[in-house]
Amino acid sequence: MSLELTSDAFVNGQSIPAKYSCIGKNISPALAWNEPPAGAQSFALIVDDPDAPMGTWVHWVLFNIPAGTRNLQEDLPITGKNVDPNAIFVGKNSSGNTRYDGPCPPSGTHRYYFKLYALDTTLGLLAGATKEQLLKEMQGHILAQGELMGTFSK
């Protein structure tokens, strides 16, 4: 089963507005998705750029998004320091930050993939986990996934 991931900020395959990039406010865009399959216990989100010169660059990692959530607001006010057990956990991006870091390609047009996963469990990872740790922990627990891709150039 697939999830339909959308944004009010940009259309799949189109340009991401500068507001969400390093040359703008560098805030996260609003995201929304449809109902997950039965049994979903949480969601995870990975945002990355496969066109980065040194290999895929990770811009945002979120996990343990509560199962009842169907959207993330623009400029989501979360950091990696979670004390609420019901809070969304933020992983570490390629800049070493536990936050959203928007598109900032050195040159040319890059593609930015927002990948959402519906999981049959909540994950035992701590805030600050990497994309690689998250992917390993999600193995065997993905019920559905969806993708939204936007482009950006400076």
Residue ranges of each PLM-predicted region?
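N-terminus-centered regions that define maturation/targeting leaders and the start
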Residues: 1-154
